[in-house]
A protein has these predicted regions:
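Conserved hydrophobic site in ankyrin repeats
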Residues: 20, 45, 78, 112, ...
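Ankyrin-repeat inter-repeat connecting loop/turn
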Residues: 16-19, 52, 85, 119
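Start-of-repeat signature of ankyrin repeats
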Residues: 26, 59, 92-93, 126
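Ankyrin repeat boundary/linker residues
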Residues: 22-23, 56, 89-90, 123
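Intrinsically disordered, low-complexity regulatory segments in ankyrin-centric signaling systems
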Residues: 1-36, 40-43, 47, 147-150
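Ankyrin-repeat-protein effector appendages
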Residues: 1-11, 115, 124-127, 131-150
Length: 150
């Protein structure tokens, strides 16, 4: 284990011996590392067989957290590892794509679409990523896919 990863685990109150387990604050290291954009830690945790289906207190998975961080390396590592790209959180029903579209993260939207994110999923309030697109570029990206039927 690299010293910077050991330090990160210790500084965030995770077990060095069992690095994929939650800390005392009920936070999963994969979620926090993704949220912080720590691709090195995310890759390490994935190598340690971190569960891909863990969620935070709001029901968001690690992919959502990586999208929040706007970190394409974390997003790519999680998608490559097989994270559920279309996971819908329990609170709003939003997916990572819906979140990214609604917050103007254009690069993230492009990356998720290239990986096959479902554009037809809806929030509990019946909104799709297209409905919530925050920028013209995102609107164009999503509307081209919806019109083509992909």
């Amino acid at each position: 284990m690299k010293p910077e990863i050991r330090d990160w685990l210790q500084n965030n109150y995770f077990s060095v011996a069992q690095p994929v387990l939650k800390n005392g604050a009920d936070i999963y290291p994969l979620i926090l590392a993704s949220q912080q954009g720590r691709a090195d830690v995310v890759r390490f945790l994935l190598e340690q067989d971190a569960a891909l289906d863990v969620v935070d207190q709001y029901g968001n998975n690690a992919l959502w957290a990586a999208c929040y961080a706007d970190n394409s390396d974390c997003i790519g590592a999680l998608i490559h590892a097989g994270v559920d790209i279309d996971h819908q959180n329990a609170v709003s029903g939003a997916t990572a794509l819906i979140f990214a579209a609604s917050t103007g993260r254009e690069k993230v939207v492009g990356q998720l679409l290239a990986a096959g994110a479902d554009t037809t999923l809806k929030t509990h309030d019946d909104f799709t990523a297209l409905d919530l697109a925050a920028t013209r570029k995102i609107l164009k990206l999503l509307s081209m896919l919806v019109k083509s039927g992909d």
